[in-house]
Amino acid sequence: MADQLTEEQIAEFKEAFSLFDKDGDGTITTKELGTVMRSLGQNPTEAELQDMINEVDADGNGTIDFPEFLTMMARKMKDTDSEEEIREAFRVFDKDGNGYISAAELRHVMTNLGEKLTDEEVDEMIREADIDGDGQVNYEEF
C-alpha cells in the first residue's frame, strides 16, 4: 500500500512525522496522530482516528512507528481518492445536477462514450442499479 506513494509524499509524511516525534525515538503517540494528519490536509474524525490506531498499533502500546504511519496514510489517501472519483463520475452522468441519473442522461453519456445502446439496454442498466424502484439512479445506488 505504502509503495503506491510518491517519493515526494513519503518525504512530506516523514517530515510531518518527525515534527511530532518529540524524543526522536521513531514513534508517535496516538494523541499526536490527529495533529499529524491534520497538518497534512487530512481531516479524520475521532472515530476514524481510533479505528486507524487500532488497525495500525498491533501491540496496543499507544505508539505508531513510521512504517505503520505510512501504511495508514496511504490507505487514508486511497479511500479519499476513490470516494472523490466516484462523486465526479456521478456528476458526469447527472447532467442536470438534480442528484439522479435518468434513462435519458445515461443514454446521452453512453452515446458520447461511443456506446450505442437500445432503449431496452438503457432501461435494463437503470433497473439493475435502481434499488428503490423510482426509475432513476441516485448517488447511493450509483
Swiss-Prot record:
Which Pfam families does the entry mention? Answer: EF-hand_7
Q: Where is the EF-hand domain?
A: 8-43, 44-79, 81-116, 117-142
GO MF, one annotated term: calcium ion binding
Where is Ca(2+) 4 bound in this sequence?
Answer: 130, 132, 134, 136, 141
Which amino acids does the record list as binding Ca(2+) 3? 94, 96, 98, 100, 105
**One GO CC annotation:** myosin II complex
According to UniProt, the name of this protein is: Calmodulin-alpha
